[in-house]
Amino acid sequence: MITIDKILEILKNDHNFREILFHEHYYYNWTQNVTFNALSYDSRQISSDTLFFAKGATFKKEYLDSAITAGLSFYVSEIDYGADIPVILVNDIKKAMSLISMSFYNNPQNKLKLLAFTGTKGKTTAAYFAYHMLKVNHRPAMLSTMNTTLDGKSFFKSHLTTPESLDLFRMMATAVENQMTHLVMEVSSQAYLTKRVYGLTFDVGVFLNISPDHIGPIEHPTFEDYFFHKRLLMENSNAVVVNSQMDHFNIVKEQVEYIPHDFYGDYSENVITESQAFSFHVKGKLENTYDIKLIGKFNQENAIAAGLACLRLGVSIEDIKNGIAQTTVPGRMEVLTQTNGAKIFVDYAHNGDSLKKLLAVVEEHQKGDIILVLGAPGNKGQSRRKDFGDVINQHPNLQVILTADDPNFEDPLVISQEIASHINRPVTIIIDREEAIANASTLTNCKLDAIIIAGKGADAYQIIKGNRDNYSGDLEVAKKYLKR
């Protein structure tokens, strides 16, 4: 519940209030007592006591008309649509929605310890590590790209890396109702670009890495813009953990100089001194030897990042050790074995840098023929297509099958051809993803060989023309073709 007086107070304090406009009359205050028992940005979810946020580049007046027909009596907007109900006009609808939602749900962020991860890759894996560390002796909720849990028991698929602010604070409130003590979440650059976490301060923020990604017409116009929005997490955290090996580390180091911080990686006090496939040793604040199920040094680095963050939240080294040992992540370096002994690696690697690291791990263990099944999504991250080509060109013996991966409103054949145009040798294009995986499974001969299925991980859908069409998921499809 929230009153109109409280809403106006919030907006005025944030210098985000213009006026209330109704029948061409302007109001700075509203004398009538009005209380809202629901918030919505979806015109299909409206009742008479709902406050509606008219937001988005594609918003149309007919959506507002539909909401008014359903009983809407007030809305918030940057634009006066000339409707027959009062409008609260603001300078920034996204800022307004975040702060009003925060208050509506009784500031649940103050009742949870908040841990956030950002970075081009590794956010989900690091979040899972932190979740398992905290779970040993606490009650953490988690919002991740892969799965969300608000009670530690039931899990559901997330639609956005970071939810819309209204949904985010509703989820936090549910976690509080479920007596959760901590919230682990991923914070994307888009979350700051679209102000989904506006006004939110995290107890610990972690910056894992940065490389060019999410650059395109509907995302970030430049790498500078992408990097800037990533760094906003540092300014909005009470303590930070940063990878000292990341590109452009010096600017981040300077930015966090006066914030309590830990660095990890080479040239820092928290460093891996021994790395085996399923164990590693750390010097520094986390000094110990750790067992780990996820292979690859980059996963060990993600574990250190999560461990340092949890240490700042009061988690013991023993709980950190147990958490790392227990962590698995759906769609992250999942391994199957064909009857001929060849390995199938299913991984979410979905940009050039993560593909590069995935190939390095597989090539370290598999010395025979390696087949890569790969695609790129439509209508986003267009720079990935060239990046994939550049990485593939560094592996001349790699056999490549290009296929569909969430083509959305683009033609998957055109996407595959664009990737192929950046590759310096012939590749195979099989648009049907299951057919591509089936074909790859026929190309191995012995235990030294491997198939890498990259991009979708555990996602059991294909995004086609704005819809999530059913797809079994790469792991389930690969299981069908183990006989070789």
Swiss-Prot record:
UDP-N-acetyl-alpha-D-muramoyl-L-alanyl-D-glutamate binds at residues 43, 161-162, 188, 196. GO terms for biological process: cell division; cell wall organization; peptidoglycan biosynthetic process; regulation of cell shape. It comes from the Bacteria. ATP binds at residues 119-125. Coiled coil: none annotated. It catalyses: UDP-N-acetyl-alpha-D-muramoyl-L-alanyl-D-glutamate + L-lysine + ATP = UDP-N-acetyl-alpha-D-muramoyl-L-alanyl-gamma-D-glutamyl-L-lysine + ADP + phosphate + H(+). Keywords: ATP-binding, Cell cycle, Cell division, Cell shape, Cell wall biogenesis/degradation, Cytoplasm, Ligase, Nucleotide-binding, Peptidoglycan synthesis. Catalyzes the addition of L-lysine to the nucleotide precursor UDP-N-acetylmuramoyl-L-alanyl-D-glutamate (UMAG) in the biosynthesis of bacterial cell-wall peptidoglycan. This is UDP-N-acetylmuramoyl-L-alanyl-D-glutamate--L-lysine ligase. It comes from Streptococcus agalactiae serotype III (strain NEM316). The gene is murE.
